[in-house]
Each structure stands twice: as C-alpha cells, then as structure tokens.
A protein has these predicted regions:
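Proline-centered turn/helix-capping motifs that create local helix->coil transitions or kinks
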Residues: 131-135, 145-155, 231
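ABC ATPase nucleotide-binding domains
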Residues: 105-125, 132-141, 157, 379-394
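Regular, well-ordered alpha-helical segments
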Residues: 96, 103, 121, 125-128, ...
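Short hinge/gating elements
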Residues: 124-126, 159-163, 257-259
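ABC ATP-binding cassette signature C-motif
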Residues: 1-109, 166-394
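ABC-family P-loop ATPase nucleotide-binding domain
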Residues: 151-175
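Generic structural signal for well-ordered, non-transmembrane alpha-helical segments
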Residues: 141-144, 174
C-alpha cells in the first residue's frame, strides 16, 4: 500500500528511502551520495553497505558514518582548505595514516628546532673566537641547510572532550522497574525493567526512536512514566544530553554568559578553559547563542555537561550535528570514561567501540544482552527474539 502513497504524505525516513531507491535505480555509471545514511535504520544501512561494496561502477559519497565508509570505500579524498589529496584504502586506514604523518612531521620539526637552537647558541658563543672560526663557519652552513618545515594550518580541529567524574560510583547505580509509557495512543515500551551495574556502558536501541528519547527523559527526571519507578544510587551524579536542545538557546546570551548559568565559578577565565576545549576561542565566546549552528550548540551542550563532573552520562544521539573530528574525540573519551554511560546512537562505530551492553526497547518488552553491538546484530537468537517482540499483537 505504501507504494501508492503521495510523497508529501511520507515521513522523513520513508522519503529518504524513496530518494535512495531513485538514485540507485538503473545502476548509473556514477553514483553521488550526500550523507546517504541519514535517517536510515540499522537494517537499511547494513543493506546499503552490502549493495555499495559490491557496486561495479563509481561511487562518490560524503558521510559522517565511519563504519559505513570503511565498509564501502576503496579510496579517500581528503579536502583540507585548498589541498585535495587522494589516499588508497578505507577511512580507518586514512585516519591512522594521517595521524601518523602529522606526528612524524611534528617530531621532525621538534628535532630540527632543537638542532637549530644548539647551532645558534654555538655561533653566538664563539663568533668572536678566532680559534673556533672554522667550526663557527661550518655551523653557519649547517644552519642555512637546516630545514624546519612549516606545518600547514588545518581545518581539522579536535575538541578536548574530557569527562572527569568527581567521585567514583558506588555499587548501586540505577534501578528501573516496570516502566511503561504510551504517547498519543501508541505504546512506546511496556514493563521495562533493568539494573545498571558498575562499569556498564549501555547502548539503547529501538525501531521507534521516540521510545529511547522518552525513556531517557523519564530517567533524567523530565517526564513521568504511566507506571513503574526509577531509583538512582546515592553516589550517582548524572549529566544528560537531550536529543532536542532548542529550549536551551531561546535567548540572546553570549556563549560565555550562557555557560555561566550552569557553573559555580562564573569567572570568564574559568569558563574560557571549557569553551576553548570546545574550539570557541578569542571573541567567539561573545557570540549570541541564538545564532549558533547545530554543531556549535552541541559543543556548548557538551561543555555544559563537562562542568558537572558526572559519573553517569545519559546521551541521546550525541553525534548529531557533530563533524568527524568531534565524533572521533567524543568516541575516544567515552571509551576511556571510568563511570557509567546510557546512550543511543545511529553511528555503528560509536556504539560498537563504547557499549559493553545492549538494551533494545520494543512495544512488547525489552531485550537485554551483555555483549558488543557487532555480536548483538549478528546473534541468531537475538534476531528471533526481536522478530517475536516486534510482531506480537498488542
């Protein structure tokens, strides 16, 4: 029946799938895809990865999904200001290679600078000494030949996303018992119960994204369940990154004054430290928050979270609006984070490298598995259980 619906009546996810089908139809010689995984569910992304990795013609794709790029790409085109460079290999190979090259150049420059300083000190010290004139002349020639390569400025800047818990968690983190929620007549989840243990980093999944957002709102204390209870441990200090942050920016405060609302220390010097880590430097901190881009707002929200020194993070789709460098920095820190994390994401790599436990919400119950994301999506027993829970009549 969906095949005969008007495009205008379709939701965003359905429209994306129609446009994707239109692009793929006829197997064109050159396929240009701009963020093709946006608004696609996990199963569709996996299908697209498989389809494109076996595609016989040319594919040019822009994406922030690192796993997707690794799965389909044979070459990476790196555009950095006016420089365009072509690399053989997938995204991970390019990332590791570029990081290694940057470190090697920095080390070479450091050694060259040290040698330059040593030669200049010798020349200054013995320039008036006739007995050392030969050695001085020799070192002058060495100094002229010494090449300290100028490191070109890069548009790639990695924010300092560092969450540091003020205190270690106790043994009791979070207990959720019998939570149910129906919105506008649609049951999002029913009698959901789970206990978060010390060290758990839990990725929440659902075919209905509103279910996860609603659950997080309830856990964070911003919404009420139809039934059930949420109980936090006494040692837990949580920080919440909501999916929709628009209400935080409905004002004309400057970035620094906006952040001051959430800080005990409101001095500009202190706040600059946090904003600098989030790549807001100089006079940028006086920019009005109501004109910020989606990525800038997200960096403000992350700075706000860092101020809390929380030992439990609740993150609803945290990579939204972030560039690749910010996603990588976020990902790297969460892997090292010593507290607990409850999060949702559409980023395969992000989930697989952070989560050690998966909880999937369905209208007819939940699935709770202590395993990685890769293991979860390929587990036959999980697939059977998902089919049963999603297809059970209410």
């Amino acid at each position: 029946a969906l095949h005969y619906e008007k495009m205008g009546s379709l939701n965003a996810k359905e429209k994306v799938r129609v446009l994707l089908a239109q692009a793929l139809f006829g197997k064109p010689d050159n396929l240009l895809l701009d963020e093709p995984t946006n608004d696609l569910d996990v199963n569709t992304i996996m299908w697209l990865e498989n389809y494109l990795s076996n595609y016989e013609n040319t594919v040019l794709v822009v994406s922030h999904d690192r796993h997707f790029l690794d799965a389909i790409s044979t070459h990476i085109i790196d555009i950095d200001y006016s420089d365009i460079n072509l690399f053989s290999g997938n995204y991970s190979f390019w990332y590791e290679s570029s990081q290694l090259a940057a470190r090697q150049q920095a080390n070479q420059n450091k050694k060259a600078e040290e040698k330059k300083k040593e030669l200049m000190e010798f020349i200054q010290r013995f320039s008036a000494n006739v007995a050392k004139s030969k050695q001085t002349t020799s070192r002058k020639k060495m100094l002229e030949k010494l090449n300290v390569e100028e490191i070109k400025p890069s548009m790639r800047k990695y924010p300092g996303i560092i969450f540091q818990p003020e205190r270690e968690t106790g043994t009791k983190i979070l207990a959720v018992d019998g939570l149910s929620k129906t919105v506008n007549g649609e049951k999002l989840f029913d009698k959901v119960s789970f206990t978060i243990e010390k060290g758990d980093k839990v990725a929440f999944l659902s075919r209905e994204p509103r279910a996860i957002t609603t659950l997080f709102e309830i856990i964070a204390g911003h919404d009420q369940p139809d039934s059930g209870m949420v109980e936090w441990g006494v040692t837990i200090n949580s920080a919440y990154l909501p999916l929709n942050n628009s209400d935080f920016f409905n004002n004309e405060l400057s970035i620094v004054d906006w952040l001051a609302q959430f800080s005990d220390d409101t001095s500009e010097l202190y706040l600059r430290g946090y904003l600098g880590k989030m790549l807001f430097s100089g006079d940028e901190i006086y920019k009005k928050v109501n004109v910020l881009s989606g990525g800038e707002k997200m960096r403000c929200m992350i700075a706000r979270m860092q101020l809390r020194n929380a030992n439990c993070l609740i993150l609803d789709t945290p990579t939204n609006h972030l560039d690749m460098e910010s996603i990588q920095a976020f990902n790297n820190n969460l892997k090292l984070f010593k507290g607990n994390i409850l999060f949702s994401s559409h980023d395969h790599e992000f989930i697989n490298t952070v989560a050690n436990r998966i909880i999937e919400l369905t209208p007819n119950g939940s699935i709770d598995k202590l395993m990685t994301y890769e293991d979860y999506i390929h587990d036959d027993r999980v697939k059977e259980l998902k089919e049963k829970l999603y297809n059970t009549a209410d």
